[in-house]
Every structure is written in C-alpha cells, then in structure tokens.
A protein has these predicted regions:
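Membrane-proximal envelope and lipid/glycan-remodeling enzymes
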Residues: 1-452
C-alpha cells in the first residue's frame, strides 16, 4: 500500500488538473444531440427521422448514450466518462515495466502537454482513445508472460476492436503494434485474437449498414469530398501539425524523445509504436489536419510516452545516481552549476506558453488572423463562452435540473445540461418531422441543443 500511495496521488492530481481546465467543445454536442434523439425516440440521427451518422466515434457515442440514458444527466455523464478514462490512461503508464522515477517523469510531461490535457476532456473521444490505446500497449508489453495463452489473444483482439470502434483511423496508429504481436503469437493465440476482433466490429458494421446505409461515418466521406489537390491538403495538414507542436512543447518533446530512444535501443514494440505514430500523423496531414489545434496530437503524444517507457525497460537511473553521490566533485558540479541552469532552460521551454499549470487560460492566438489559416485555440474560446467544467461545478445545483424553454439563447454548459436533461420524448401520436427547420453555420452543436 505504501508503495502504491505516490502513484495514486499522482493519478489523482492529474485527474484534478484535467478537471480544472475541462471544457465542452461544440463538436461534441453534435454527438450529444444524436444520442438525445435516439434515446428519446426521435431516431439515430442529428435531425429528426434522418438516419445520418454524423459522429466519428461509435464507441464513445454508445458509452455516452448508455450512461446518459441511465443517469438522466447528459453533461455530468460525459464529464464523468472523461475523467474516469483519463485516470485509466494515467494508471496504465504506471503499469509499464520501467523504473518508477521514469514513469513519474512521463506523467509530469503528459501533464505539461497541452494537447493531452486539453483533449482529455472536450466531450470528444480523445480520453477514451488514450485509455484503449494504453490498454492495448500494456497487453502487448506483457505478452512474454502469457504469449501462449489463448485468453491473452482474445483480450488483445477485444481491445483492438475497442480501439477501432473508438475511432476508425486509429487503425494506422496501432496496426504496426498488432502486426508485430500477431506474427510472434502461436496459432491458437492468433485464432483467439481474430475471434476477439470480429464479433464487435461485425456487429457494429452490420447495424451501421442497416441503420445508416453506410459502413463509415458521414464525416469520412465529407473530408474526402473536397475539390483540393493532395499537395494543398498536405500543406494545410503539415501546417496544422506544426502549429499544434508550437503550442505543445512538452508533447513535441515526448515525440522527439520517443523517436531518439527508439533508434537508440531498437526495442521491437517501441519501433512499432513509432512507425504507427508516423503513419497516423502522415494521414492527419494528408487530410488537411483539423481546425482544433492539438486535437489530433494527443493520442500520438500519449503513445510516445508509452513507447519511451518500453524503450527504457530494464534501464535504471540508480547507478548514475550512486556514482554522482560517491564522486563529490561531480555531485557539486551537477547540483550547483549544471543542474539549475539546465532545469531553468527546460522549464522556460516547456512553460513559455500557457499550460494546464498556468492561471491565465486565454486564447493563445486569434484564429481569424490570416496566419492561423483557420486553426483555432478552441478550449480557451469555449471556456470564455461558459463551456468550462468549472462553470458546471460552480452551478451544479442548477445544471442537474431539467428545462425545455426554446426562448432562451444562453448556450453555456449549465443551460446545455438543463436543456439536454429536459429533452422531449416523441410519442407515437406525434409527427416524425419537425414543423420548422433552422439553418446555421458555425456553433452547430450548441445551437442544435438550445433550439431543441
């Protein structure tokens, strides 16, 4: 118990840090509206009686649908899911077989990573992505202990299917890891893995095809249906990644160290992880990136932290520490002349821009300026509009209530919660199509919840 106490404290502090700057993005409310319509009898689409898969994260959608329907608290449920998934992701880092001080250092760097911390909430699938990717890595790392057990193969297959159902493009991130494991596994374990993957994926694809007449989300086809050349898309996507790294120096450091250690130690799982990260980021760039700075960097940054732990397995800081303790001159040089300046420079690099530890959480740049090329610093912008978790916590007695008043235009997280909790149920005698249709451009999710 005594040995686990520091780990529990660190994970708890990490969750509190994430909750402190937690927020709800407008895109997540598109998923929420679909879940509300489906749970209240209006059909499995964003618009009433129109079956279109407007969300990109089936497993996150199903989890939100289930927890929200059972609890009746739709915003509280996504806050809870995000924080639980974040706690799981941080705990999984501590389960990897490397020295404890290294694991603690990785948690600190993740806490300084803007992309990881900011998108551990947002209402999007990122926290679940962290948790399922981390679960897969832990299972693969421990393959040497149970590689001949069919149950282990079944577990790997099930977790892989959860990764894919969380977001289908994550297949590029984890495919090298799975292929490496699959080649080394015995025949019985391979069969078990396939049996673990197929049922969940087949069930979802069947339901999606019957319900939406499509295997993939509508957003996949929307992103590909643009009148732009590959080089134009890649240029914008590369700019997106560069901008995201500029505002997430800790994340960039994790990615860089992950690559360096992979090349230095050449551990197979670390090599597979780095290859997956390269494939995934190349795919993000080829699609033109995104408008939310850092969103598609959080999972690669987290996987890179896991890769570092794998690379440093069996490597200990203790001999280095002991040698410095025994040599007084080296110890004096490090403590007085090398350590403090190095720590100061590293801190200046990491904390020169706003992080989760900063009190100031205003927008780091204006998305409307031409130099931003449409990329926005989403979290501070929505917090200023009242979509931060702290606003919800401070008015929780009001937020848990139910209301349905289409006259109000308040789109804060508190009003979104009240409106979602009071979502009307369609009766059999009611018509399926609305009497009025509203069109809007921008902030579609929030406006759709407020308008009902």
């Amino acid at each position: 118990i005594r040995g686990a106490f520091p780990s529990v404290v660190l994970v708890g502090m990490g969750v509190l840090l994430v909750a402190r700057i937690g927020w709800l993005s407008d895109d997540s409310l598109i998923t929420l509206r679909t879940a509300l319509n489906m749970s209240h009898g209006w059909g499995p689409g964003f618009n009433v009686s129109e079956a279109v898969q407007g969300y990109t994260h089936p497993l996150w959608f199903l989890a939100w649908l289930g927890v929200g329907w059972i609890s009746g608290q739709w915003i509280a449920s996504v806050i809870l899911m995000s924080l639980v998934a974040t706690a799981a992701a941080l705990t999984l880092v501590l389960l990897l077989p490397c020295e404890r001080r290294i694991r603690f250092a990785l948690l600190m760097l993740l806490a300084l990573s803007n992309s990881f911390v900011e998108y551990s909430t947002s209402g999007l699938e990122n926290p679940l992505s962290h948790a399922v990717v981390g679960s897969l890595m832990v299972l693969l790392v421990r393959q040497r202990e149970v590689i001949e057990r069919s149950f282990h193969g079944l577990a790997v297959g099930v977790v892989l299917s959860l990764v894919l159902l969380t977001r289908f493009d994550l297949v590029l991130l984890v495919a090298p890891l799975f292929i490496f494991w699959f080649i080394r596994a015995s025949r019985s374990v391979r069969i078990a893995a396939v049996l673990g993957v197929l049922p969940l994926l087949a069930s979802w694809f069947y339901w999606s095809l019957v319900t939406y007449d499509s295997l993939l989300p509508n957003t996949f086809y929307a992103k590909r249906n643009v009148n732009l050349s590959f080089m134009e898309l890649f240029d914008q996507g590369f700019f997106y990644l560069r901008t995201s790294l500029a505002y997430d120096r800790a994340g960039g450091l994790l990615l860089l160290v992950g690559v360096v250690l992979t090349l230095a130690f050449m551990k197979p799982l670390a090599v597979a992880s780095s290859l997956g990260i390269v494939l995934y980021l190349t795919y993000v760039a080829s699609n033109g990136g995104d408008f939310m700075v850092g969103r598609f960097l959080s999972v690669p940054v987290y996987l890179s932290a896991l890769s570092i732990a794998v690379s440093l397995e069996g490597w200990s800081l203790e001999p280095l520490v002991q040698s410095f303790r025994q040599n007084r001159m080296n110890s004096l040089l490090v403590r007085r002349f090398i350590g403090p300046p190095l720590l100061l420079v590293l801190s200046a690099i990491l904390i020169s821009s706003a992080t989760a530890f900063s009190r100031q959480q205003s927008e780091r740049f204006n998305w409307e300026r031409p130099a931003s090329r449409g990329i926005a610093d989403e979290r501070p912008m929505y917090v200023q509009r009242g979509s931060g978790f702290m606003r919800y916590f401070s008015e929780i007695s009001v937020a848990v209530k139910s209301t349905y008043d289409p006259r109000t235009e308040d789109s804060s997280i508190v009003e979104i919660s009240r409106r979602a909790n009071g979502w009307p149920t369609r009766k059999d005698s009611e018509i399926q199509r609305p009497l009025t249709v509203r069109t809007t451009c921008g902030l579609l999710g929030g406006k759709s919840i407020i308008s009902g």
